[in-house]
């Protein structure tokens, strides 16, 4: 059986965490992880992976495979295949499909369609019927079908709906996702409000477009109880509000995207459309705060926010 030697195993809690390891592979499946020892045997198919690290499979809590609705952009089968090649063990596809995932049969369908894939699905159901933000979906039936979380893949605009959702889902133990963005605060904004947006002559989105919504949602959580997840946080001020809420004992978790950890609004110079995001890249100070939060426990997840488009 061939061995693949990695510079280190990254798996906190494992006795070999941080140490060089040999990965034993049989029939294209990992069957063992042992301390790196002795010379590798090229005739057996052994390979030295150099500086590569070995990780347990990653989980991506926000990706859109455009299935059903616009499968031409990717589709579930292709998306899960590529996710496996990228090292992801689990993916949570967003519920904003067409039709949206607001019925138990749709949860059962995605579980059935994905069960033969190496990468598994973490089913997310729509929070409101038709994602219209008016009436809650049948949460109990959806949870029984396999839904693990509930999200409209959008901000929950109506405070009363978020309150009822947190109260009801608190009894089920399922988290409610609410996007940290107030679309009515600066509806014309298309990038972070700052020096870069001024130089480029583009309308900005201030940090308040995020922090006003985070503080409102935390106030509702404080009143209603339940579990709140904020999928993408982009600002230092928003992170601080969540950090304070966690210290207070509120059941809130949050994430950010890999894009927000890597780039800033200054990288849009030259009008780079590839970095124009609906939740915009922020300042260098915000990026530093996000990186710090990834290590101090404030951030609970880093997501791909993978959303393929057709050429049209």
Language-model features: where?
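Active-site anion/phosphate-binding pocket segments in diverse small-molecule metabolic enzymes
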Residues: 304-311
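Metal-cofactor-binding active-site regions of metalloenzymes
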Residues: 60-63, 67, 71, 86-106, ...
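Catalytic pocket of metal/acid-base enzymes, prominently hydrolases
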Residues: 52, 77-91, 108-120, 162-197, ...
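Divalent metal-coordination and catalytic microenvironments
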Residues: 7, 28, 51, 62, ...
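Short, acidic/polar
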Residues: 72-80, 131-141
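N-terminal metal-binding scaffold of metallo-dependent hydrolase/deaminase domains
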Residues: 1-41, 52
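Histidine/acidic residue-rich metal-binding segments in metalloenzymes
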Residues: 137-302
């Amino acid at each position: 059986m061939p061995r693949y030697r990695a510079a280190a195993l990254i798996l906190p809690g494992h006795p070999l965490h941080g140490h060089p390891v040999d990965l034993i592979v049989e029939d294209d499946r990992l069957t063992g992880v042992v301390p790196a020892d002795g010379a590798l045997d090229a005739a057996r198919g052994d390979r030295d992976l150099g500086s590569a690290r070995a990780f347990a499979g990653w989980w991506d809590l926000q990706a859109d495979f455009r299935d059903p609705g616009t499968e031409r952009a990717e589709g579930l089968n292709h998306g899960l295949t590529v996710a496996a090649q990228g090292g992801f063990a689990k993916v949570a596809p967003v519920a904003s499909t067409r039709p949206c995932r607001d019925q138990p049969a749709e949860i059962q369908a995605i579980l059935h369609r994905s069960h033969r894939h190496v990468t598994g699905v973490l089913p997310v159901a729509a929070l409101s019927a038709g994602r219209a933000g008016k009436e809650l979906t049948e949460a109990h039936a959806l949870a029984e079908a396999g839904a693990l979380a509930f999200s409209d893949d959008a901000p929950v605009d109506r405070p009363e709906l978020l309150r009822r959702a947190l109260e009801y889902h608190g009894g089920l133990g399922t988290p409610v996702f609410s996007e940290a963005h107030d679309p009515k605060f600066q509806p014309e904004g298309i990038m972070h409000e700052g020096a870069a947006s001024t130089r480029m002559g583009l309308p900005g989105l201030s940090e308040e477009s995020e922090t006003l919504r985070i503080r409102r949602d935390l106030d509702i959580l404080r009143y209603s109880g339940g579990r709140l997840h904020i999928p993408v946080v982009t600002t230092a001020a928003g992170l601080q509000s969540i950090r304070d809420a966690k210290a207070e004992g509120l059941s809130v978790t949050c994430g950010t995207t890999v894009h927000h950890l890597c780039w800033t609004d200054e990288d849009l110079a030259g009008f780079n459309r590839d970095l124009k995001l609906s939740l915009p890249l922020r300042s260098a100070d915000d990026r530093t705060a996000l990186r710090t939060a990834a290590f101090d426990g404030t951030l609970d997840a880093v997501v791909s926010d993978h959303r393929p488009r057709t050429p049209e």
